């Protein structure tokens, strides 16, 4: 349980919408430039399960950089209420195993999948939201985080014009940077040697992108596009992480306030975060699928055609929702929080997430081996 004083929640609709819109900008840019769907849990799961790709590290590094940059510009932050270390470890383990089983989280399914009207993503999101509400209510996550009973809606706050201006400028600068990366990737051959040199200095990480993967994840021919492919993911991580901070998603009390629907301090801000992201991603993804033949730096888009609603997907949604409701945090915000407000609880949560992903892989491998052995008898 948090040892801090009671936290009074405030309904922050514009913060949530603006932060969500910035999440949408990063998500669309990643798809247009690299052809990959943004999924934080996937970028954690691959290295956790022994698959190492440079863009995953770039993306996760961008999330960490967003947290560090916020501290550098805003100054030391007050300690953020978190559940106890043991509960955080359990919550992270459930989220890690659930996201691995369901192949996604609040970003991969909640934003990317729902923006494409994916039946799997809509089902998974519905399950983890419902279970999250139940877990937060039954196990009193609001109480564990010492959330005050005062109404959040009655304490609605609007950001200052200065804050809105900074966020708008950041979003515009991000769009400009993504456009610049796209232009760099497609402009002539003059910088080819520089790109090769950069690849050599990076220990072959950039060229590894091309040698390790097949389409749709293999970048297009040329060192420049291979380099931009990785740099783009780093910038996407930074922009996405900043959107998480602005929206309040890095604060477990905000998430728990939303999931605790029966609590007097119920805070609907989180719904507007997803709404802001989907308001951009839904038309953005439609435009990309209809009019963009290929990503800027890859051969094909990585859209999944799987629409099967199986037991593994549903079980993953249940586990993810349970962990989310118990701890009030999900993969993306947890990575940002490591650099922004590090604490034993957040390290335990992230460690639990990785553990859940590793255990899930080992159990799956054991089942597959057992099935093969049974089939050979």
Segments the model singles out, each with a brief description of its role:
Residues 1-377:
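Membrane-interfacial helix-loop segments of redox and metal-homeostasis proteins
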């Amino acid at each position: 349980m948090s040892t801090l004083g009671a936290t009074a929640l405030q309904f922050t609709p514009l913060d949530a919408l603006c932060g969500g819109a910035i999440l949408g900008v990063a998500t669309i840019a990643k798809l247009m430039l690299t052809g990959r769907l943004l999924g934080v849990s996937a970028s954690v799961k691959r290295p956790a399960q022994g698959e190492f790709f440079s863009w995953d590290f770039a993306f996760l590094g961008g999330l960490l950089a967003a947290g560090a940059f916020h501290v550098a510009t805003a100054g030391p932050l007050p300690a953020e209420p978190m559940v106890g270390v043991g509960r955080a470890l359990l919550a992270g383990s459930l989220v890690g195993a659930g996201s691995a089983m369901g192949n996604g989280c609040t970003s991969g399914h909640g934003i990317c999948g729902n923006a494409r009207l994916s039946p799997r993503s809509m089902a998974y999101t519905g399950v983890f939201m419902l279970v999250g509400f139940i877990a937060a209510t039954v196990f009193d996550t609001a109480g564990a985080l010492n959330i005050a009973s005062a109404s959040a809606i009655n304490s609605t706050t609007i950001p200052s014009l200065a804050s809105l201006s900074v966020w708008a400028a950041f979003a515009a600068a991000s769009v400009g940077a993504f456009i610049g990366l796209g232009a760099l990737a497609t402009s002539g051959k003059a910088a080819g040697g520089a790109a090769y040199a950069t690849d050599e200095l990076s220990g072959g990480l950039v060229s590894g992108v091309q040698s390790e993967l097949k389409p749709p994840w293999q970048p297009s021919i040329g060192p420049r596009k291979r380099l931009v492919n990785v740099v783009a993911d780093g910038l996407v991580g930074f922009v996405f992480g900043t959107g998480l901070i602005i929206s309040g998603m890095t604060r477990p009390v905000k998430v728990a306030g939303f999931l605790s629907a029966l609590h007097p301090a119920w805070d609907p801000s989180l719904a507007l975060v997803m709404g802001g992201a989907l308001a951009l991603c839904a038309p953005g993804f439609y435009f990309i699928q209809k009019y963009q033949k290929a990503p800027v730096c890859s051969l094909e888009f990585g859209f999944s055609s799987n629409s099967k609603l199986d037991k593994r997907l549903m079980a993953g949604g249940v586990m993810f929702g349970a962990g989310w409701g118990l701890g009030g945090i999900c993969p993306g915000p947890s990575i940002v929080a490591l650099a922004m407000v590090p604490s034993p609880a957040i390290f335990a949560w992230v460690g639990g997430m990785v553990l859940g992903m590793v255990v899930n892989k080992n159990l799956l491998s054991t089942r597959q081996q057992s099935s093969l052995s049974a089939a050979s008898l």
